[in-house]
């Protein structure tokens, strides 16, 4: 028996007409391009689904490949679309774990011209197809295909195709993409309809009347009615506005030193138990160095904090506030109030101990175990023990001045070159007396020079 995603929720259709039979809100994307019913204005014409660029038939009427799920759109350049092993398959009611296997297909969207005449390429969007369906229905799991990312759950048998029927857009709406708890969405991507951005493709979201006059106007290359919304128009308008302002839509916001300092100070001003470490305020600035009492975090996670791509899956293990208070052993301990010069205040510590239990049936179990093993007691494997991240060497103040002073102190005073320079007294020799006698007119040596000379 073939499985139909969402069939467990199948029932009576909503009388308001805005819900599909599986209880999912109707939403049209590239994966669900079809015109709505035209009531009595279509004059008996049968409603035909739109063809996509990759499914245009060569001849005859071919049902295009419609994904069962909404797409995932890239919004940052240079990001890689990939999932951890055992993750990446959208969940849907009625699909067992053994059938959760398939691939994500990259849809390269068109480019448009900006007001300054440059071509702007829209970033691609990805759609999921079960194994044995979609554009690469004949491919085997794991084949090296450009623009294809293979995913499967741990319980799925990838050597056989999934027993999933092709989606008929006239009877089944696209299901908003959701993943099992613990799944890490690739950075730089968002799920269509998840609230990250307004849905970019809404073609066919309103019934359009296409009488003979409308067909003639379309064939004459005249302007389409203003109510027609082209695919990706929302993103195109946003890109045009940014181009007008001289900004790049794909350029991330730059963090300056001043803004990083403000973020760090804002985090450190919070109580210790309320701090959230990130790139601007790393783990060791928030909670101190790693050691026996704070033994979690490898070099990369200590640097990025909660911004680490592996952190969200660990957050699945974190207890709630209720579990913390009602599922732990708590003890209130009074601590010293501080120094004698400080203000008098009572200081307490709420000490706690507990455990989080999980088993191999937890979604993403293998990834969780891998991340835990890499970060538990990681400080022991680093040089310097608890100093996982070496502090930045600080320049000692006054070192240069002290060295200059020592150099001056070590310089010896130059000795006088002669006894005259040193002004040292000495007794005259006979040669001195003879020379003085020749100089003096009377030939007598003065008594003052007999024993001492300042010459």
Swiss-Prot record:
<feature type="modified residue" description="Phosphoserine; by host">
    <location>
        <position position="425"/>
    </location>
</feature>
<feature type="region of interest" description="Disordered">
    <location>
        <begin position="382"/>
        <end position="429"/>
    </location>
</feature>
<feature type="domain" description="CoV N NTD">
    <location>
        <begin position="64"/>
        <end position="193"/>
    </location>
</feature>
<feature type="compositionally biased region" description="Low complexity">
    <location>
        <begin position="9"/>
        <end position="23"/>
    </location>
</feature>
<feature type="compositionally biased region" description="Polar residues">
    <location>
        <begin position="30"/>
        <end position="42"/>
    </location>
</feature>
<dbReference type="GO" id="GO:0019013">
    <property type="term" value="C:viral nucleocapsid"/>
</dbReference>
<dbReference type="InterPro" id="IPR037195">
    <property type="entry name" value="Nucleocapsid_N"/>
</dbReference>
<keyword id="KW-0805">Transcription regulation</keyword>
<feature type="modified residue" description="Phosphoserine; by host">
    <location>
        <position position="390"/>
    </location>
</feature>
<dbReference type="GO" id="GO:0003723">
    <property type="term" value="F:RNA binding"/>
</dbReference>
<feature type="compositionally biased region" description="Polar residues">
    <location>
        <begin position="215"/>
        <end position="227"/>
    </location>
</feature>
<feature type="region of interest" description="Dimerization">
    <location>
        <begin position="267"/>
        <end position="384"/>
    </location>
</feature>
<dbReference type="GO" id="GO:1990904">
    <property type="term" value="C:ribonucleoprotein complex"/>
</dbReference>
<keyword id="KW-0804">Transcription</keyword>
<comment type="subunit">
    <text>Homooligomer. Both monomeric and oligomeric forms interact with RNA. Interacts with protein M. Interacts with NSP3; this interaction serves to tether the genome to the newly translated replicase-transcriptase complex at a very early stage of infection. Interacts (when phosphorylated) with host DDX1; this interaction is essential to produce a full set of subgenomic and genomic RNAs.</text>
</comment>
<feature type="binding site">
    <location>
        <position position="167"/>
    </location>
    <ligand>
        <name>RNA</name>
    </ligand>
</feature>
<feature type="binding site">
    <location>
        <position position="125"/>
    </location>
    <ligand>
        <name>RNA</name>
    </ligand>
</feature>
<dbReference type="GO" id="GO:0044177">
    <property type="term" value="C:host cell Golgi apparatus"/>
</dbReference>
<keyword id="KW-1040">Host Golgi apparatus</keyword>
<dbReference type="InterPro" id="IPR001218">
    <property type="entry name" value="Nucleocap_CoV"/>
</dbReference>
<feature type="region of interest" description="Disordered">
    <location>
        <begin position="159"/>
        <end position="230"/>
    </location>
</feature>
<feature type="modified residue" description="Phosphoserine; by host">
    <location>
        <position position="170"/>
    </location>
</feature>
<dbReference type="InterPro" id="IPR044344">
    <property type="entry name" value="N_prot_C_CoV"/>
</dbReference>
<protein>
    <recommendedName>
        <fullName>Nucleoprotein</fullName>
    </recommendedName>
</protein>
<feature type="compositionally biased region" description="Low complexity">
    <location>
        <begin position="193"/>
        <end position="212"/>
    </location>
</feature>
<feature type="region of interest" description="RNA-binding">
    <location>
        <begin position="56"/>
        <end position="197"/>
    </location>
</feature>
<keyword id="KW-0694">RNA-binding</keyword>
<feature type="compositionally biased region" description="Basic residues">
    <location>
        <begin position="393"/>
        <end position="402"/>
    </location>
</feature>
<feature type="modified residue" description="Phosphothreonine; by host">
    <location>
        <position position="177"/>
    </location>
</feature>
<dbReference type="InterPro" id="IPR037179">
    <property type="entry name" value="Nucleocapsid_C"/>
</dbReference>
<feature type="modified residue" description="Phosphothreonine; by host">
    <location>
        <position position="429"/>
    </location>
</feature>
<feature type="domain" description="CoV N CTD">
    <location>
        <begin position="260"/>
        <end position="383"/>
    </location>
</feature>
<feature type="modified residue" description="Phosphoserine; by host">
    <location>
        <position position="194"/>
    </location>
</feature>
<keyword id="KW-0597">Phosphoprotein</keyword>
<dbReference type="GO" id="GO:0044172">
    <property type="term" value="C:host cell endoplasmic reticulum-Golgi intermediate compartment"/>
</dbReference>
<dbReference type="Pfam" id="PF00937">
    <property type="entry name" value="CoV_nucleocap"/>
</dbReference>
<dbReference type="InterPro" id="IPR043505">
    <property type="entry name" value="NCAP_bCoV"/>
</dbReference>
<keyword id="KW-0946">Virion</keyword>
<feature type="compositionally biased region" description="Polar residues">
    <location>
        <begin position="49"/>
        <end position="61"/>
    </location>
</feature>
<comment type="function">
    <text>Packages the positive strand viral genome RNA into a helical ribonucleocapsid (RNP) and plays a fundamental role during virion assembly through its interactions with the viral genome and membrane protein M. Plays an important role in enhancing the efficiency of subgenomic viral RNA transcription as well as viral replication.</text>
</comment>
<feature type="region of interest" description="Disordered">
    <location>
        <begin position="1"/>
        <end position="62"/>
    </location>
</feature>
<dbReference type="InterPro" id="IPR044345">
    <property type="entry name" value="N_prot_N_CoV"/>
</dbReference>
């Amino acid at each position: 028996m073939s499985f139909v995603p969402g069939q467990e929720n199948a029932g009576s259709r909503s009388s308001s007409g805005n819900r599909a039979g599986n209880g999912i809100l109707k939403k049209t994307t590239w994966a669900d391009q079809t015109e709505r019913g035209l009531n009595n204005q279509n004059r008996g014409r049968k409603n035909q689904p739109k063809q996509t660029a990759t499914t245009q038939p060569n001849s005859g009427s071919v049902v295009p490949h419609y994904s069962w799920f909404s797409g995932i759109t890239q919004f940052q350049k240079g990001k890689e679309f990939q999932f951890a092993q055992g993750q990446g398959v959208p969940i849907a009611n009625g699909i067992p774990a053994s059938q959760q296997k398939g691939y994500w297909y990259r849809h390269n969207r068109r480019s448009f011209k900006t007001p300054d005449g440059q071509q702007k390429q829209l970033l691609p969007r990805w759609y999921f197809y079960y194994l044995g369906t979609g554009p690469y229905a004949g491919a085997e799991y794991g084949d090296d295909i450009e623009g294809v990312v293979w995913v499967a759950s741990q319980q799925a048998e990838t050597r056989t195709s999934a027993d999933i029927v092709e989606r008929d857009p006239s009877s089944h709406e696209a299901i908003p993409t959701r993943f099992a708890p613990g799944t890490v969405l690739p950075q730089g991507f968002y799920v269509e309809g998840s609230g990250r951005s307004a849905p970019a493709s809404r073609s066919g979201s309103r019934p359009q009347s296409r009488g003979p006059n409308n067909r003639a106007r379309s064939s004459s290359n005249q302007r389409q009615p203003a109510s027609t919304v082209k695919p990706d128009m929302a993103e195109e308008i946003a890109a045009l506005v940014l181009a007008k302002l001289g900004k790049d839509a794909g350029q991330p916001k730059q963090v300056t030193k001043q803004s990083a300092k403000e973020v760090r100070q804002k985090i450190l001003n919070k109580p210790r138990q309320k701090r959230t470490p990130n790139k601007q305020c790393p783990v060791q600035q928030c909670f101190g160095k790693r050691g026996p009492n704070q033994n979690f975090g490898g070099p990369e996670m200590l640097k990025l904090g909660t911004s680490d791509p592996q952190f969200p899956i660990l957050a699945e293990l974190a207890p709630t506030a209720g579990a913390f208070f009602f599922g732990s052993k708590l003890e209130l301990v009074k601590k010293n109030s501080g120094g004698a010069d400080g203000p008098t205040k009572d200081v307490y510590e709420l000490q706690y101990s507990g455990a989080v239990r999980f088993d191999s049936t937890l979604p993403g179990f293998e990834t969780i175990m891998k991340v835990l093993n890499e970060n538990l007691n990681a400080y022991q494997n680093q040089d310097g023990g608890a100093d996982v991240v070496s502090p930045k060497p600080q320049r000692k103040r006054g070192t240069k001045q002290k060295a200059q002073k020592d150099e001056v102190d070590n310089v010896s005073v130059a000795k006088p070159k002669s006894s005259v320079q040193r002004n040292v007294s000495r007794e005259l020799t006979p040669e001195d007396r003879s020379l003085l006698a020749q100089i003096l007119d009377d030939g007598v040596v003065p008594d003052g020079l007999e024993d001492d000379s300042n010459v």
